[in-house]
């Protein structure tokens, strides 16, 4: 498997600019509400909700916002959201997977298709791009929690398959069926986690023409900015950008 580098298969996230803050909170709130609606409202008893709350805290979402999102799941009325996945190919034929959470699949499909078309890419059918990826459990830990030297041994002892250290965080990879067992083992040492999620990791990363890097980044960021989009994955490698 290719290394899960910063740009290869990264789940492109927003948050670099303050103006993105409200969008991040909106997406996190939606995920918290849906997770609470589908399961127990106690994060300790609901793995999906626990992961959503964990991500919200890592993004510095106020506690009141988190509690309101959970309470919203109990409302008698409200939109019914569904998870939908779109696959396609962007500039230079990079493979892309877009995960959405929507209350209007026609609107979402139209928006995603338009973004792909404007980039010179195309939206494909289910399975058209995902065969370039594998789903793995991804656990991210702030580097303040543990050193580079200690995290590798801990990851192996906890049942993980891979461990990578980046500038600000450690990333532990495992089989998706084992993610909560691995995390439970990590919790014997680690207190604060950035996120615990199932992600699409590329089997191989694809190098692209340096002249097209900016347009590819713009394409991926435009996908991210759609209100219905939760996660964007690609198999592109953009070097040091």
Name each model feature, range by range.
Residues 1-124, 129-138, 178:
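N-terminal cationic and glycine-rich segments that engage phosphates or anionic surfaces
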Residues 138-241:
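Positively charged, low-complexity, intrinsically disordered RNA-binding extensions
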């Amino acid at each position: 498997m290719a290394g899960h580098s910063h740009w290869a298969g990264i789940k492109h996230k927003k948050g670099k600019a303050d103006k993105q803050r409200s969008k991040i909170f909106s997406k996190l709130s939606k995920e918290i509400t849906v997770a609470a609606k589908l399961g127990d409202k106690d994060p300790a008893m609901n793995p999906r909700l626990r992961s959503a709350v964990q991500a919200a805290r890592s993004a510095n979402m106020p506690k009141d916002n988190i509690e309101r999102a959970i309470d919203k799941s109990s409302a008698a009325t409200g939109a019914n959201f569904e998870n939908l996945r779109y696959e396609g190919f962007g500039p230079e034929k990079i493979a892309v997977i877009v995960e959405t959470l929507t209350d209007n699949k026609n609107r979402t499909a139209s928006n995603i298709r338009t973004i792909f078309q404007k980039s010179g890419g195309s939206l494909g059918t289910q399975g058209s791009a995902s065969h370039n990826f594998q789903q793995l459990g991804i656990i991210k830990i702030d580097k303040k929690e543990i050193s580079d030297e200690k995290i590798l041994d801990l990851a192996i002892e906890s049942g993980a398959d891979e461990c990578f250290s980046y500038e600000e965080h450690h990333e532990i990879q495992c089989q998706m069926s084992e993610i909560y067992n691995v995390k439970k083992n990590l919790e014997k040492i680690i207190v604060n986690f950035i996120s615990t999620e199932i992600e699409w990791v590329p089997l191989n990363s694809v190098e692209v023409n340096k002249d097209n890097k900016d347009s590819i980044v713009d394409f991926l960021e435009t996908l991210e900015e759609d209100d219905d989009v939760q996660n964007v994955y690609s198999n592109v490698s953009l070097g040091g950008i």
